[in-house]
Structures are given as C-alpha cells and as structure tokens.
Amino acid sequence: MNNYIIENKNILGKYRNVRNELLNKTDKYILSDYPITLEKQMIIKTYRQDLREFINNNEIKILAGDMVEFPQQPDFINLNIIY
C-alpha cells in the first residue's frame, strides 16, 4: 500500500470520528422525554440518517483526496463541533 492510500484512509477515519461525534451529540434529541416538537424531532432523525449514510456516499471522494462537507445540521441545534 502506498503512502497516499494510507494517508487517505487516515483521513477517512477522521471523517468517521467526526460523524460519530455528531451522532452522539444528537442522541438526546430523539429521546421520547426530550422537550422538542415532533416536527423538529423528525428533522433530527433525517439529519442523523444523512450522517449515517455520509461515509458510504462519500468514501470514494474522501479516499481520492477530495474535500466533502458534512450534512448541514438543523439550524435549531448547536453541536459545538469544529471540523
């Protein structure tokens, strides 16, 4: 394996780590006792699904060295994650 591939696999791992952190920080919003409207909860669920699909949908681009953007987080939450 050449260094380029190894480096890009490390970058892919970093994308996974950020994605996992975003998922973890949105867990509370889907709990049944969290004070949020049903509409906003559905938006969060869609956002979380987009995050789960993010790596599969962008793996080739990431491994090719392209910059890809994470799904846009809903405007009513602030996850305080810098990536």
Model segments located where?
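A preference for well-ordered globular domain cores
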Residues: M1-Y83
